[in-house]
Amino acid sequence: MSAIEQTAEGLRLRIFLQPKASRDKIIGIHDDELKIAITAPPVDGAANAHLLKYLSKAFKVPKSAIILEKGELNRHKQLFIPEPKLIPEELQPLL
C-alpha cells in the first residue's frame, strides 16, 4: 500500500508522525509513509488531536469526519479522510 490511497469515498493516508516539531508541516514521503511534523507533544493524546485539527484545516473537512484507523499510540498511523474538499499542494503530485 502506498502512502496515499484514493478511493471513491475519500483518501486513506499512511502517516509517520513527528511530534514536538518547530512547526506544523507536511514534509513528504518517508519509507512509504507520509511524514507530517506537528508542534504538539506526544502526551495524553495531544499529538493525535493536533494532527486531526491540522489535517481538518488542510483538507477542509470537519475534525469529527477524519477517522484514525490505526496507530493511536504509535508514530505510524493510518487515517481516512472522507470526501476532502481540498487537496494540499504538497500532496497533489503524489496522487
Curated annotation (Swiss-Prot):
Domain of life of the source: Bacteria
InterPro entries: DUF167, YggU-like_sf
One family name in Pfam for this protein: DUF167
Gene3D superfamilies registered for this protein in UniProt: YggU-like
Gene Ontology CC: cytoplasm
SUPFAM superfamilies on file: YggU-like
PANTHER family linked to this entry: UPF0235 PROTEIN C15ORF40 (PTHR13420:SF7)
Similarity comment: Belongs to the UPF0235 family.
Name listed for the protein in its UniProt record: UPF0235 protein MS0322
Organism: Mannheimia succiniciproducens (strain KCTC 0769BP / MBEL55E)
Taxonomic path: Bacteria, Pseudomonadati, Pseudomonadota, Gammaproteobacteria, Pasteurellales
